[in-house]
């Protein structure tokens, strides 16, 4: 049985992503594969190339033939040189710089805006703020209503006859 190491396509229309697969030479491009040994994402910068070197060496040693695109990928990772015994087995694979974490970016933005990092959220939660305000307003309503009712009675009594009205609040 002739075995090939080839690319099987995944992804969207203009965003191809490939798996590096070992399959029978007679199967179609995205057909059944014997083993998946890596992946390749050409649209990323730099391109993502991950190949399980141990499995690639095994399949090359038992006679699997890489297709032209896979051969180029194997040369980039250094697996082809390692298999053939050529110099340059370390490969010339470019690695993307590590991305800063979101927490570091957040703390840096806070430091620029205010002057120092804090662990608290920028704004309090809406539910907590509204429920606390409602409770405070409900507690203040009966007190405010009682004081408002007492003031008009006291103001109206001296205006009528000049007599001092006895307030019911004193007893």
From Swiss-Prot:
<comment type="similarity">
    <text>Belongs to the bacterial ribosomal protein bS16 family.</text>
</comment>
<protein>
    <recommendedName>
        <fullName>Small ribosomal subunit protein bS16</fullName>
    </recommendedName>
</protein>
<dbReference type="InterPro" id="IPR023803">
    <property type="entry name" value="Ribosomal_bS16_dom_sf"/>
</dbReference>
<feature type="region of interest" description="Disordered">
    <location>
        <begin position="114"/>
        <end position="171"/>
    </location>
</feature>
<dbReference type="GO" id="GO:0015935">
    <property type="term" value="C:small ribosomal subunit"/>
</dbReference>
<keyword id="KW-0687">Ribonucleoprotein</keyword>
<dbReference type="GO" id="GO:0005737">
    <property type="term" value="C:cytoplasm"/>
</dbReference>
<dbReference type="Pfam" id="PF00886">
    <property type="entry name" value="Ribosomal_S16"/>
</dbReference>
<dbReference type="InterPro" id="IPR000307">
    <property type="entry name" value="Ribosomal_bS16"/>
</dbReference>
<keyword id="KW-0689">Ribosomal protein</keyword>
<dbReference type="InterPro" id="IPR020592">
    <property type="entry name" value="Ribosomal_bS16_CS"/>
</dbReference>
<dbReference type="GO" id="GO:0006412">
    <property type="term" value="P:translation"/>
</dbReference>
<feature type="compositionally biased region" description="Low complexity">
    <location>
        <begin position="142"/>
        <end position="171"/>
    </location>
</feature>
<dbReference type="GO" id="GO:0003735">
    <property type="term" value="F:structural constituent of ribosome"/>
</dbReference>
């Amino acid at each position: 049985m002739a075995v090939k190491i080839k690319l099987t396509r995944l992804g969207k229309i203009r965003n191809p992503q490939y798996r590096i697969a070992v399959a029978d030479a007679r199967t179609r491009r995205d057909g059944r594969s014997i083993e998946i040994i890596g992946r390749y994402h050409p649209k990323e910068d730099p391109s993502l190339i991950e190949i399980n070197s141990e499995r690639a060496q095994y399949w090359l040693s038992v006679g699997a033939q890489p297709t032209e695109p896979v051969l180029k990928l194997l040369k980039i990772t250094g697996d082809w040189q390692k298999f053939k015994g050529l110099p340059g087995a370390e490969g010339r694979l470019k690695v993307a710089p590590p991305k800063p974490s979101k927490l570091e970016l957040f703390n840096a933005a806070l430091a620029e805006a205010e002057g120092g990092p804090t662990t608290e959220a920028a704004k309090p939660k809406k539910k907590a703020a509204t429920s606390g305000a409602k409770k405070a307003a409900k507690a203040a309503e009966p007190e405010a209503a009682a004081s408002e009712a007492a003031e008009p009675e006291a103001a109206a009594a001296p205006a009528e006859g000049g007599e001092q009205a006895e307030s019911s609040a004193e007893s």
